[in-house]
Amino acid sequence: MRTLEHLFGAESPASGRELLCDRTFDLSSVASARAALAEHARARGLTDIDLTKFVLAVHEVMINSVRHGGGGGRLLLWCTADALHCHVDDDGPGIPPSLRNLRRRRPPVGRIGAGHGLWLAGQVCPGVRITDRAGGGAEVCLTYPLPGRGGPDQGAAAPGNCSPPGSGEASASGRR
């Protein structure tokens, strides 16, 4: 079993969590990354609307990385006892503060770069955390509760509970 310590060392905040998926992506590989994500999420118990919501949220963040974050990024997926966690990072300019309020009103239709993807991710995924990487780029961590093991009202998907690997040290991608 590959663990996050294997990639980031024993000091990783995600210590003891099994790494399910670690892959870089660009426009040509978003579909295969999304399929792998769905397969892992299904294997961990997400079905129907929960599976659709989680995969949609991660897909929107990946597309943002392709469009606005330098042409691609890196996706890490891991599981804890009560939730799936997905970390996406890129080498773009970061995400403007005005687009980080995921509970804001729907962005205007027809404006590219207005934050539709982040807004949608925030609507369908109970836990979304957006941070800037030192030296440039964005990190988005999505947390989705596993069925019967907790829920948003029980804190399983609170955005603060999603500790991306290597936070406070090197980024999850090792790209600083």
What residues fall within each predicted segment?
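Glycine-rich phosphate-binding loop
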Residues: 110-125
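STAS-typified acidic loop motif
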Residues: 19-35
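Conserved short strand/loop->alpha-helix "switch" segment adjacent to the catalytic nucleotide/phosphoryl-transfer site
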Residues: 31-59
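Short beta-strand-loop-beta element adjacent to the nucleotide/active-site pocket used for signaling
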Residues: 79-86
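Short helix-loop "hinge" at the ATP-lid/N-box region of the Bergerat-fold HATPase_c
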Residues: 65-66
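Flexible, glycine-/charge-rich segments associated with ATP-binding catalytic modules
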Residues: 2-24, 123-176
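Glycine-rich/acidic phosphate-handling loop/turn and adjacent ATP-lid/helix
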Residues: 86-114
